[in-house]
């Protein structure tokens, strides 16, 4: 495909997560978009704490609950449900921004934390 890794590659229509859900629609599989904005360097160093938020979305409440439980077993990581799977394109679009920031600031561990909102 080419181009800088910090550019967004739009998948029409929707997102990679929606495309996966469409491919799997005849199987008894529930798709949850997660971990898009968590550095692979962080994930490779579990159980070290990851001081980031993990945005998730999906169409099945139970599947999102399972994903959230897995995410929150990782020290420091917090799952934030942003809604249905049609929001996955938003999460996927953040990833190149985060990669670009990590490149610019010579880091492998940059991430996002949502502040100012009471999620309880």
Regions found by a protein language model. Give the residues of each.
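Oxidoreductase and adenylate-handling cofactor-binding alpha/beta cores
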Residues: 26-27, 73
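Short, well-ordered secondary-structure micro-motifs
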Residues: 43-45, 92
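Rossmann-like dinucleotide/flavin-binding elements
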Residues: 25, 39-42
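Short, catalytically relevant binding-site loops at active-site mouths
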Residues: 1-2, 38-40
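Conserved beta-loop-beta element that borders a ligand/cofactor-binding pocket
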Residues: 28-37
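Active-site-lining helix/loop region of Rossmann-like oxidoreductase modules
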Residues: 52-120
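Short beta-strand and adjoining strand-loop segment in the mid-core
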Residues: 3-13, 18, 22, 45-62
């Amino acid at each position: 495909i080419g181009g800088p890794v910090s550019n967004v590659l739009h998948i029409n229509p929707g997102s990679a997560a929606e495309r996966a859900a469409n491919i799997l629609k005849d199987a008894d599989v529930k798709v949850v978009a997660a971990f898009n904005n968590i550095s692979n360097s962080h994930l490779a160093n579990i159980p070290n704490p990851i001081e980031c938020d993990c945005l998730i979305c999906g169409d099945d409440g139970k599947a999102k609950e399972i994903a959230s439980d897995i995410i929150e077993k990782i020290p420091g990581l917090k799952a934030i449900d942003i809604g249905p799977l049609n929001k996955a394109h938003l999460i996927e679009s953040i990833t190149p921004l985060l990669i670009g920031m990590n490149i610019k600031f010579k880091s492998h561990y940059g991430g996002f934390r949502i502040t100012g909102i009471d999620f309880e």
